[in-house]
Amino acid sequence: MNKIQAKAPDPIPFGKEAFSPQAGTTVRWLGGAGALVNCRGTNILIDPVLEGFDMPLLVESPLQVEDVPQADAILLTHSDNDHFSRDTCRDLAPVCGAYHAPRYVAGLCRD
């Protein structure tokens, strides 16, 4: 029996334009478990792992930290390495209005 590694399609790269005000709501896949939700210019990053991943990735991140002009909030669901990156949290802090996470994950962000 042959075993194969399933691989998701490569995410579509995007940059600062994805954060602009718009008429509706757009959800963009960040690769892995993450997403960017832009609802009429309110931008929420969910489980962004844009850097600091501790193993090779099967797909490249479609967004770089330096291309995030602002985020109204970052939601961190839990601390598994495909949902949480200290490096990403640290580097997005200057452009992020608020972080929301369970108490344990919030403590990791402060470390």
Name the predicted role of every residue range.
Residues 33, 80, 105:
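A generic "binding-loop/recognition-motif" signal
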Residues 83, 91, 107-111:
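Phosphate- and divalent-cation-binding pockets in alpha/beta enzyme and binding domains
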Residues 30, 99-102:
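Active-site-adjacent beta-strand anchor residues
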Residues 24-26, 94-99:
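Short active-site oxyanion
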Residues 29-31, 40:
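Short loop/turn positions at the edges of beta-strands in beta-sheet-rich folds
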Residues 23, 31-33:
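Residue-level marker for the onset of beta-strands and adjacent loop->beta junctions
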Residues 13-19, 36-79, 86-91, 101:
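Pre-active-site segment of Zn-dependent metallo-hydrolases
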Residues 2-23, 101-111:
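Metallo-beta-lactamase
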